[in-house]
Structure formats: structure tokens, C-alpha cells
Amino acid sequence: MSTVVLVGAQWGDEGKGKLTDYLAREADLVVRYQGGNNAGHTVVVEGQEFKLHLIPSGILHPDKVCVIGNGVVIDPGVLHRELEMLRAAGRPLAALYISERAHVIMPYHRQCDELEEDCPESLRRIGTTRRGIGPAYADKYAREGLRVVDLLEAGAEERLKLIIRRKGEILGRIHRAPAPDPERVAQEYLDHAEMLRPFVRDTSLLVHEAVRAGRNVLFEGAQGTLLDIDHGTYPYVTSSNPTAGGAAVGTGIGPRVIDTVIGVTKAYTTRVGDGPFPTELKDETGEHLRAAGREYGTTTGRPRRCGWLDTVITRYAARVNSLDYLAVTKLDVLTGLPVLRICRAYRYQGREIHDFPSRLSVLAGCEPVYEELPGWTEDLTGVRSFEELPAAARAYLDRLAELSGVPLGVVSVGPGREQTLPLADFFHRR
């Protein structure tokens, strides 16, 4: 038995969905532990592309069990559409269970998110996905949220109407926005509750029993380390904990259950939305990375900001997640660039710093200190083992691992399952 946590080691969009799908072959359970439909995971199976936002990426393995944990915020309408999309594709699917403790995104959460992002004077305007994620988490921690189990309780209709009416009054006072109709929204969510009912379980108990029975469990994070509410580039962050610690809190298991933590990083760096980005490239190289890597958000379609690989970031991710391995994706995107750069440190006010700063003013003033390595011209998409990679590509990966202080565990050279080069056996470490 092994339990493996897969986390993003950058600003999200690192390719966790592809790797979750790949690693799910050896897992018995695939568990999503935080975030909502602000995350986008693209999985390619036999040439068919699936874009998922809520459902764990292991859903396309019919012999597995997929779990949406208590740390996730759920938009029932989005979940329903994803299930319908998967069923329409005609592929057999894994069993799916949803935590009864997971919180629910309401229409007023989405409305509030949009209003804050559209208000020029808003202090909360940070470039969100406008999906209501932040307001839903805010209500959770203010103890004003609604859990999945609350929608299934007797008296749910009256409680829904009361909360919707109160939230509508607040939206009207602060934003002068039209209030949602309590009758209509309450009925809509009661209908959603019936759709959810067959999937709802005490998933903490389900995962605990799987671990006790010696089954392999894969915990799938959304977003990335630098979007973590506590350890990310605050306030340009998400509203949950994508870091490895979030796997325990977001699923209801103890931290000592976790055996292995894998940090996923692209062979370069990307970011969506606002905030400092020391290695950002605003030139032809940045455009090349965006075009070759198809760097557009799965959820929003926004173009991603692109830059050179930053090992100040990967070292930081290694520290806050206790990374055992690195998984490097999109190595093939670097093909054709004559010279590659890796950021090994920052220079701030004349001195070199090697640790990621918490102050945004410092991060914004940092200049990257680069090492240069030779590129390669060979097409990597047909490579099927690490040894087949060009010498320059292997040297680049080795230096990435050395500067990060974490060994390589897997390398990806394309979106397909078969374009994955394993270097470690994650589920048989004990």
C-alpha cells in the first residue's frame, strides 16, 4: 500500500491532470482535496481530449474509485455538465463519491465574484476565474456556507430561502446588484441535491478504510504551491491550500498516512492573472513558449504568461511540500530553442537571494540570476525512455533537479499517456 500526493510546484497549470491520469493506473482511489471548478485539468486518452474542472482526473479509469473531498467547493451545475459530457463520450467511468462535508457554490457567490472583479476600486480585484470560488470559501470560514449534506436535510428549503434572501440584501446594499430569486434558486438547488444524493458519502471514512485495507491512494491537488492561500504570492492566490498539507485537511485523513509527495513543474514557468513573475518573458521566446505549449487557460481561455524555469520557486515548493520527487512536464516545448536559461537565484538591491520572498514588493523588485545551457533540435514527442532523450535534454533535467534539491521521478514529452517517462516506482516505496 502507498499513498501519493500530487501537487503543483509553480503557479498551477503544470500538467497535474495528465500525470494524475497516468498514475491512476496503479492507484485504487483518486482523491481531489481542494479547489473548485476554477481548476482545469486536460486528459488525453487514445487521442480524445477531456477537459475536467471538478471531477478527479482518474475518472477515465473504469476500475478505480474517484473521490471529491471535503476541501473542495462544488458547483452542482458544473458537476452535472461534466458527468453528462463524460457519459456522452461513451467511455466507461470510475465510481464517483462526493464528501457530504464539501461546501456548495451558490449563484450569489458567482455574482459577488464577478462584481468584485468588475469594480475598479475593489481591493479584491486580482484576476479570478469569476467562478465564485473565493466567496464560497469566505462563507465557509465565516460559518455561513452550505454543505452538500445540508441540502439533503429536512428543512433545507426554508434554510436555503433564508440564506439566499439575506445574501441578496447584502449584494443590493454593497453593489446595488439585483438579488437572486429565493424561490427559484432554492428549488434549483433542491433539484441539484437529488442529483448529488447517489454520490454522497462520508468520504473521510471511505479513504480511511481504503488505507487500512492496504489500497493505493492518489491525492490530486488543484492549482499550485504559489497559489496557496498561506504560502503563495498573497493576495494573488486561490482560497484554499493546494500544498501537500491540504491533502490531509481536505480529505479527513491524518498527515502520517502520506508516504510520497510529487511536485509537478513545467520545464519552464507560466502564470495566469496578476502578480510578480521574475522570469517572465515578454519577447519572441515568451511567444514561442505560449504557442508551442498551447498556454491558454483550460477554465478561462486566458493566455498564460510564460517565462524561463525558476528553481527558486521549485526549491520553495520542495520545502513547503516536503517533495520526494519532481515530475517535469512539457519538456518537448523547449525543442528548437538554441539556448535555455534556468533561474538559480534572484538579485535584489545588489545582493543575491536564494529563498523565495514573502513580501510582494521584494519579489517585484527581484531580477533573475540565470545559468545558460545548450538547447536541442530533436523532436522529443516520440521518446519513450529517459535514455532516449538527447544529451542536452538530459543535462537540462539533471541541472533542474540539482538546483531544486529534489530527484526526478517522471518526465513528460507530450499530452498522451504513452508520452510519459517514469524514473521511479511511486506506489511501491515501502
Curated annotation (Swiss-Prot):
One of its GO terms (biological process) is IMP metabolic process. Keywords: Cytoplasm, GTP-binding, Ligase, Magnesium, Metal-binding, Nucleotide-binding, Purine biosynthesis. Transmembrane segments: none annotated. The active site is at 13 (proton acceptor), 41 (proton donor). One of its GO terms (cellular component) is cytoplasm. IMP binds at residues 13-16, 38-41, 129, 143, 223, 238, 302. GO terms for molecular function: adenylosuccinate synthase activity; GTP binding; magnesium ion binding. It is found in: Cytoplasm. Pfam families: Adenylsucc_synt. It is an enzyme of class 6 (ligase). It comes from the Bacteria. Homodimer. Belongs to the adenylosuccinate synthetase family. This is Adenylosuccinate synthetase. The gene is purA.
